[in-house]
Design a protein with these regions (language model features):
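N-terminal secretory signal peptides that target proteins for export/translocation
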Residues: 1-6
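Bacterial N-terminal signal peptides
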Residues: 8-21
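Short sequence/structural segments immediately N-terminal
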Residues: 22-345
Length: 346
């Protein structure tokens, strides 16, 4: 084993010993493997499917073959290729998967040959996640492991629209478990996150406007260290993008009160998955106003919310008047482009 690799994986805490040798540097062009020949010629679609899928896998493109993960001797024909004495592993047990992937992906020197920009702390992060802890501490067979999100034989880079972790695919990938009510029943957590997210301004910005920088599941929950944002830091998560709003909220009276009540800052008013585009209608005590969830017309906060809404409505009315005046002036032949530009920022 290469030095430093066990240290990187030791925190996984799995009582699993893999006899599979570490993959050597992959050749520029992977030699033909008996695995491929047999799996394609046996007439069993179940066995042929992985081979066909792997043809477009990022690992195949880098020169890795079946034996890189499954072990054995691909130069041998027949059953001799699957000799346990030569490190043949076959289909890894679910608990083996993070350690198996981490043999390469946790080794900075090895990964530098193929993608120096790729992080090598994925396994370290995974063991701190809800998924990793349940796998390590409870042996939970249903939690996500590497191949749950990255299909074992069809892994593509996130930039590939066909990838399961392309920004437009992440929500569906997470939802393959988290939107499956029977599958998630033992965990007693909601399963409507995907449905709600697809009604959010974040999803619409990404899917309809094509802005792939809009947040999806992993932007708020993390990739490999996935965890639900806690009450104490959900505002920090939102603040990664909404910096100015986070700073203003932190200085507000609401921030102190929400902390005392144990209420999550941003999500209390904006929800967490079904986040709507902010509008004037959210302010005040009318239908759809979020202030009404806590304030009533008779309390000081309710009066303040109603007054602010009235000011905004008045401003909107004045803005509409100004727009009408400028339109009339333009029709009369006046140059009003600068005024129209400034009015757009109102």
């Amino acid at each position: 084993m290469r030095p430093g690799s066990l240290a990187a994986l030791g925190g996984l805490g799995l009582s699993v010993s893999l006899s599979l040798a570490w993959p050597s540097a992959a050749p520029a062009q992977q030699a033909a493997e008996s695995c491929v020949t047999c799996h394609l010629e046996m007439g069993d679609d179940r066995l042929a499917a992985p081979v066909k899928a792997f043809a477009e896998d990022i690992h195949a493109a880098k020169g890795f073959g079946c034996a890189s993960c499954h072990g054995g001797d691909p130069k041998e024909a027949g059953m001799e290729a699957m000799d346990p004495a030569k490190g043949y592993l076959g289909k890894p047990d679910r608990q083996q998967v993070p350690q198996l992937c981490g043999r390469c992906h946790s080794d900075a020197r090895f990964m530098k040959r193929y993608n120096p920009a790729l992080r090598v702390d994925q396994v370290t992060e995974y063991v701190t996640s809800v998924h990793g802890r349940r796998l390590r501490e409870l042996g939970d067979p249903k939690v996500a492991v590497c191949v749950s999100c990255h299909p074992a034989h069809a892994i593509r880079p996130p930039s590939d629209p066909r990838s399961s972790v392309h920004p437009l695919k992440v929500a569906e990938t997470c939802g393959s478990c988290h939107a499956d009510a029977p599958y998630m029943a033992p965990y007693k957590i909601p399963t409507d996150q995907l449905q709600k997210y697809k009604g959010s301004v974040h999803w619409k910005t990404m899917a309809e406007k094509g802005d792939l920088s809009a947040p999806t599941c992993n932007d708020c929950h993390g990739n490999h260290g996935a965890a639900p944002p806690g009450i104490s830091w959900v505002g920090n998560v939102c603040g990664q993008c909404h910096t100015v709003m986070a700073e203003l909220f932190a200085k507000s009276r609401h921030a102190k009160v929400f902390t005392q009540l144990g209420a999550p800052g941003c999500a209390t008013c904006h929800e967490n998955h079904e986040i709507k585009e902010a509008s004037d209608e959210m302010l005040g005590l009318g239908e759809g106003a979020v202030c009404a969830a806590c304030h009533a017309a008779g309390d000081k906060g309710g009066k303040g919310a109603a007054d602010m809404r009235a000011l905004l409505d008045g401003l909107r009315g004045e803005t509409d008047k100004a727009r009408t005046i400028l339109l009339q002036a333009e029709h009369a032949g006046m140059e009003v482009s600068q005024a129209q530009f400034e009015l757009k920022g109102a």
